[in-house]
């Protein structure tokens, strides 16, 4: 589980004229708090864990720019994106993996079994986003890249192991990264960041 705090967003906001922030996976509000320190017009954060949403509502009660959504990420995307100004570029931080598990409410195995495709919703999130808006000027940061491909990830170097690949196969929840690169090959550049469990930073190609 990484955090948006890993990144200084200033250059991306300026270069790509980013006006809104949308994250999947509120967690304890750490990444949202970081995003809120920048001058976004609006910020959206979605989590299926009602307790985490309620906690963040209290934490950010004074910030009227922040919108907290208790829902599955794909459903929230489908609900909110059509209401947003299509001319305002968005920074997406996609981190809605394994509901309940990162905060020790349930195990990762239980999360995979209980939530199924909603435990690893990235492909459906991206497909839904791209069906609802022209993303050619939007920026995406995808967390937990190590779930989707091999690499020299900091988490692995420090002895971390993802133990549930066989369970993913059993549940037909296999993850790979080809779909990401295929989706963005015409419009964006993809840069890998191997800190923590890995990030994929997806920025518009020049001339978009």
Predicted regions and their residues:
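A short alpha-helical cap/connector motif
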Residues: 1-91, 97-208
């Amino acid at each position: 589980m990484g955090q948006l705090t890993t990144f200084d967003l200033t250059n991306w906001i300026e270069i790509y004229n980013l006006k809104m922030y949308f994250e999947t996976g509120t967690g304890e509000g750490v990444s949202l708090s970081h995003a809120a320190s920048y001058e976004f017009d609006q910020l959206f954060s979605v989590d299926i864990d009602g307790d985490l949403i309620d906690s963040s509502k209290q934490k950010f009660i004074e910030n009227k720019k922040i919108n907290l959504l208790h829902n599955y990420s794909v459903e929230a995307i489908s609900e909110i994106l059509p209401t947003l100004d299509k001319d305002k570029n968005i920074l997406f931080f996609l981190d809605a993996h394994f509901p309940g598990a990162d905060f020790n409410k349930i195990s990762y195995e239980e999360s995979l079994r209980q939530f199924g495709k909603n435990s690893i919703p990235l492909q459906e999130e991206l497909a839904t986003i791209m069906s609802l808006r022209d993303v050619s000027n939007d920026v995406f940061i995808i967390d937990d890249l190590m779930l989707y491909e091999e690499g020299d990830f900091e988490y692995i170097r420090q002895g971390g192991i993802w133990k549930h690949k066989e369970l993913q196969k059993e549940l037909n929840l296999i993850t790979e990264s080809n779909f990401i690169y295929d989706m963005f090959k015409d419009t964006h550049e993809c840069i890998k960041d191997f800190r923590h469990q890995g990030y994929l930073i997806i920025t518009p190609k020049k001339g978009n």
